Amino acid sequence: MRFAIPLGAACAWAGVALAALQIAEDDSTITLNNDRFKAVWSKSKGSVVDMFLDGQDLLGPQSGSTGIGPYLDCYCVPSGFYTAGATNPRMQYVEGTDSTGTNYAGVILNDTYTPTGQQFQQYWFLRDGETGLHMFSRLAYYNETTPFLRNLQEFRTLFRPNTQLWTHLTSSELQTAPLPSKNAVSKQVVVQDATWRFNNTPDDAYYTQFSEYFTKYTFSNQWRDNDVHGLYGDGTNSNGSTYGAWLVMNTKGPLHSDLTVDGIVYNYIVSNHHGEGTPNITNGFDRTFGPQFYLFNGGKGSTSSLQDLRSEAAKLADPSWNAEFYDSIAKHVVGYVPSSKRGSVDGRVKLPKGATNPIAILTVDGQYFQDNSVVPSSYQYWTDIDTSGKFRIDRVVEGKYRLTVYADGIFGDFVRDGVTVKAGKTTTVKEKWDAESAGKEVWRLGTPDKSSGEFRHGVARDPTHPLHPPEYLIYWGAYDWQSDLPKGIDYRIGSSDPATDFNTVHWSVFGPTPDNPDVEYNTTHDWKINFSLTKKQLRNSKKATLTIQLAGAKTASGNTDVYNASEPYINLSHESYINDQKEPLSFVIGFNQSSSCIVRSAVSCYQVRSRMEFPADWLKVGENTLTLHLPYNATDTETAILPATVYVQYDALRLELD
C-alpha cells in the first residue's frame, strides 16, 4: 500500500488546507479539523488524544488509557491484550476529494507486534461538513514458522473519555440511564466480574432510576436490534449545551451480541462474551473490518434531547450511506471491497403459517450461520423479510453464500446453500419454507424465537425502578431462586404461566447471591413438565418426538470454546426422562457450543437444539411427566468472579405424535 507523503514533512509544523477541512502535522501530532470538529492524534500513542466539537473538549484529560480514542485494541497476541500502536506506531495522513466533490483527510496507523509479526492498521477519516470519524481496522498475520497463533478473541475500537461532560449512556430505548456518579463508583461493591452494587449510595441517580447493580453487560445488545449506541451530555457540565457521542452500526449480526457502552463507547468487531465463535489467526490471516462511524453531535447552543441526538445518529445506520465516499477511499484502505466487486440478492420465501419477525441471512456456504467465523475470510449480511416474504440485500461481496431464514413462532430454520453473488449483478432467490414437522403437535412450551426472555426474570420489566429495565439485563444475582421457586419447577401445560412458573435459566446449582449466602442444589437440577393426553391423541400413534431448542447453554468451557479434559462437564449432557422410563433422551452440548449467557445479562446466545424420537407407548392416557435433568451440583473451575455452575436457557420445547 502506498500513502500520500505528508506535505512539508521536513518542517517542524506543516499545515494543509482543503477548503474548510484542514490538516496539520508536527513532530508529535497530526491534527484534522473542519468548521466544527477537531481531532488530534499522538504519533507516539497511535491514538486520538484530543477531540473537540464547537470547541468543547469531548475526551477530557489523558490519564493512562482514559481520555483517548477512538483507538484499536485486541485480545489476540499470545499473552492476551494488546493496544495497536504500543510497539512502534507509524502515523501518516492521506487526503483527497471523493466522487461527490467532498474533501476528506485520513490518518493511518501502522504497527507491528514484534514477537509474532502481527500487523495492525487503524484508519480514521474525516470529511468536510461531518462531525465524526469513519473507521476501518485491519489485522494481518504472515508467519510460516508458527502457522497457528491463537484465536482472535476480541477486536474492538474504543472511545474512552475522562470528563464529566457525559451524563447518560444508552444502547436502546430500554437501556438508557444516568451514568453512575464518581461517588457511587468510589463506594461500589464488587459482586461479579465487571459487576458492582451501589447499595452504599442509594441516592445516586443511576440507583434510584435504573438499578442497584451496574455491569457493562447490562447495556449489551443484539446487533440485529442495535443501530446506534453511545453517550449523552445533558448540558449540566457544558453550560447548558447538549452533546452526543455515538457508534453508528451500519453492519450487524444478527444474533451476535456484546458490549456497547458503559462509559466507554465500544465497537466490538470480534468477540465471544455471549458464546459466538471467533476466527483463528493462522498464516495468511488478513482481514479489514469496517466501515464504522463514530458521530459526535449536538454542540454549542444545542438543546436537543438524548432521543433527538440518538435519532439523528440512527438515520445514518444504513449500509448504503456514504458508499460513494467509501469507494473513493478504497485506494487507501487495504482489503476494503469497493462497490464494483459487490452484487445484490433479491429474494422471496413463502413463509410457514404463523411466522413473524422473519429474517434472511447470508453467511459462509455450508456452515451453520452462527459458525461463520470458521472461515476467517467470510462475510455476513442480513435483512428483515416483509410480510409477503420479500427481501433484498445490497452491497454483497461477490462469492458463494448460505441463505438462512428463521422466524419467531417456527421451530427450526430454512437453509439453502450455493447462493452465488456476482459483482454488478442481482441474484434472484425464490423458495418455499416448509416448517419441520414430526407429526401432530401436542403441546409447545415457550415461543421459538431464539430467546429465553419470555420466562421468569427474562424480558419482564423491573417494577422497582422508574426506568423499568428488562429484568434479565440487571444481574442474575439480583433474584433469589429459593424465594421465587422454593419447590423448583413443577410446570403444568395448559394452566401454568411461563412468565412466572418457568425460569429463564435452568441452573444445576444456584447461589450464593449478595443477599443470600445459601447454595441450592436440590430444587434446581430437575425440572418437571406435566401434561395430560387423551385416548384419542394416543390412538394409532407409534412415534413421539420431543424437540428442545436452547437459546444458550454453559458447559465447563464457558465462552472460550477451549477443550479441557480435566473438567468433567466440558461437554454437558442434557437428559429428558419420560414418565418412569429409566433411559433418558439425551443430547450433548459440546464445549464449542457453550455460552456465558445469563451471567452476562443475555437471554439469546449460541443456539443449540435437538429432536429426539421415542416410542409413543412411553406415554399414557391421563397424566404424564417430562423431567428435564442436568447433572447434580455440576460446576467448573472459574478464573473470573463468575458462577461456577453449568446451566441451560430454553428457547422452546415441543411434543409431537405420529
Swiss-Prot record:
Signal peptide interval: 1-19
Glycosylation sites: N110, N143, N239, N280, N522, N530, N564, N571, N592, N633
Reaction catalysed by this enzyme: Endotype eliminative cleavage of L-alpha-rhamnopyranosyl-(1->4)-alpha-D-galactopyranosyluronic acid bonds of rhamnogalacturonan I domains in ramified hairy regions of pectin leaving L-rhamnopyranose at the reducing end and 4-deoxy-4,5-unsaturated D-galactopyranosyluronic acid at the non-reducing end
GO biological process: cell wall organization; polysaccharide catabolic process
A GO CC term assigned to this protein in UniProt: extracellular region
Main location: secreted
GO molecular function term, any single one: rhamnogalacturonan endolyase activity
Superkingdom of the source species: Eukaryota
Top EC class, one word: lyase
A Pfam entry, by short name: CBM-like
UniProt EC number: 4.2.2.23
Keywords: Carbohydrate metabolism, Cell wall biogenesis/degradation, Glycoprotein, Lyase, Polysaccharide degradation, Secreted, Signal
Subcellular location: Secreted
Similarity annotation: Belongs to the polysaccharide lyase 4 family.
UniProt function note: Pectinolytic enzymes consist of four classes of enzymes: pectin lyase, polygalacturonase, pectin methylesterase and rhamnogalacturonase. Degrades the rhamnogalacturonan I (RG-I) backbone of pectin.
Listed name of the protein: Probable rhamnogalacturonate lyase B
Organism annotation: Neosartorya fischeri (strain ATCC 1020 / DSM 3700 / CBS 544.65 / FGSC A1164 / JCM 1740 / NRRL 181 / WB 181)
Name of encoding gene: rglB
